[in-house]
Amino acid sequence: MARFRPSRSRSRSLYRRRRRSRRQRSRRGGRQTGPRKITRRGRGRGKSRRRRGRRSMRSSRRRRRRRRN
C-alpha cells in the first residue's frame, strides 16, 4: 500500500497547481467578494513564484557560462 501513496500525493499536487491558476483568475475578477483573503493568499503565491523564477534564472545563467567557457 505504501507504493500507491506517493503516486496519489503527486497527482493531487499537480491538480492543486492547475486549480490554483484557475482560481486566481476568478478571484482577481471578483475582489468584491473577499479582498482580505485575496491579499493574503496572493502574497504567498507571489513569493513562491518569485523564488521559482529566481532559481530558473540562476540555472540558466550557469548553463550559459558553461557554454561560453
From Swiss-Prot:
UniProt subcellular location: Nucleus; Chromosome
Protein role: Protamines substitute for histones in the chromatin of sperm during the haploid phase of spermatogenesis. They compact sperm DNA into a highly condensed, stable and inactive complex.
Keyword ATP-binding: no
Broad class of where this protein is predominantly found: nucleus
Domain of life of the organism encoding this protein: Eukaryota
Distribution of this protein across tissues and organs: Testis.
An MF annotation (GO) of this entry: DNA binding
A GO cellular component entry from the record: nucleosome
Keyword Disulfide bond: no
Similarity annotation: Belongs to the protamine P1 family.
Protein keywords: Chromosome, Developmental protein, Differentiation, DNA condensation, DNA-binding, Nucleosome core, Nucleus, Spermatogenesis
Name of the protein in its database record: Sperm protamine P1
GO biological process: chromosome condensation; sperm DNA condensation
Region (Disordered): 1-69
Biased composition (Basic residues): 1-30, 37-69
PROSITE patterns: PROTAMINE_P1
